[in-house]
Curated annotation (Swiss-Prot):
Pfam (any one): Ribosom_S12_S23
Gene3D superfamilies: Nucleic acid-binding proteins (2.40.50.140)
Name of the protein: Small ribosomal subunit protein uS12
Assembly and oligomerization: Part of the 30S ribosomal subunit.
Gene Ontology terms: biological process: translation
Natural source organism: Methanococcoides burtonii (strain DSM 6242 / NBRC 107633 / OCM 468 / ACE-M)
PROSITE patterns membership: RIBOSOMAL_S12 (PS00055)
InterPro entries for this protein: NA-bd_OB-fold, Ribosomal_uS12, Ribosomal_uS12_arc, Ribosomal_uS12_euk/arc
Cited function: With S4 and S5 plays an important role in translational accuracy. Located at the interface of the 30S and 50S subunits.
Gene that specifies this protein: rps12
Family the entry assigns: Belongs to the universal ribosomal protein uS12 family.
Gene Ontology molecular-function annotations: rRNA binding; structural constituent of ribosome
Record carries keyword Glycoprotein: no
UniProt keyword Nuclease present: no
This protein's GO CC annotations: small ribosomal subunit
Length: 142
């Protein structure tokens, strides 16, 4: 490592090269998280329900978390989304259009005891899932 009166340019260059060893910097600079994200960096996305799936909760909990497998409209990618609320899965059928958002886990990952599920359903056919669960709104008949 140079040190002296005329070493500034070389020191800057060394710093610049060393930054690429930091995974956070390199992923951020190359936009890798946005490229690998099914929603492509958007806060929400719409998708078509392919099937209903039950995801087993991680230890020490014992439950089957009700989720849906969806295909996003914007890019055709598939993802699994959690259906929050008591009996919420009953308001969702195959081929319905759902709106999903991130579930809120740390570093964009899964949350709590649901492994591999990074999204949650917030609306079915443009009607809020929460409103349907508490009985304030009905699912529109197509």
């Amino acid at each position: 490592m140079p040190n002296g009166k005329y070493a500034a340019h070389r020191l800057q260059q060394v710093r610049k090269d060393a930054r690429w060893k930091d995974t956070g910097y390199s992923r951020r600079t190359l936009g890798l998280d946005i490229k690998s994200d099914p929603l492509s960096g958007a806060p929400q996305g719409r998708g078509i329900v392919l099937e209903k799936v039950g995801v087993e909760a991680k230890q020490p909990n014992s439950a089957i978390r009700k989720c849906v497998r969806i295909q996003l409209i914007k890019n055709g990618r598939q993802a699994t989304a959690f259906c929050p609320g008591d009996g919420a899965i009953n308001f969702i059928d195959e081929h319905d259009e759902v709106t999903v958002e991130r579930i809120g886990g740390r570093m964009g990952g899964a949350m709590g005891d649901i492994p591999g599920v990074r999204f949650k359903v917030i609306a079915v056919n443009n009607v809020s899932l929460r409103e349907m669960v508490i009985g304030r709104k009905e699912k529109p008949r197509r």
